Amino acid sequence: MSVVPKDLKYSREHEWIKVDGNIGIIGITDFAQKSLGDIVFIELPGVGDEISAGDSFGVVESVKAASDLYAPVSGKVVEVNEEVIESPQLVNEDPYGKGWMIKVEISNEAELDELLSPEDYEKLLEEEGE
């Protein structure tokens, strides 16, 4: 069973967001990293780039597949985790900690209401056979 921290919100595309004021820290879930297998390459936007909820903001490549990353919210990228670009396996090892991807200044907090609670995300995982 995948780990689903209770202090995060989730997207149906298996991204998570931790909200701290108007800043959102975004990464992929434990389920996503397990599904991908060993991650070998990550492409992320640059600081200052604008991202839009539901749109692709990067790519994660594993030995099995390449998968787009989808923004759970809209906003401006204020920090990129350079460590995961240099050491992509951090996402496999610690998807909710050292494996975070980007930090964004959230431009529309109402979009957070569209995301899944931990309980709803667990139901989604059950539907997907987790």
Swiss-Prot record:
Cellular component, GO annotation: cytosol; glycine cleavage complex
Modified residues (N6-lipoyllysine): 64
Signal peptide: none
Keywords linked to the UniProt accession: Lipoyl
Name listed for the protein in its UniProt record: Glycine cleavage system H protein
Cofactor note: Binds 1 lipoyl cofactor covalently.
Keyword flag Repeat: no
Disulfide bonds: none
Pfam annotation, one family: GCV_H
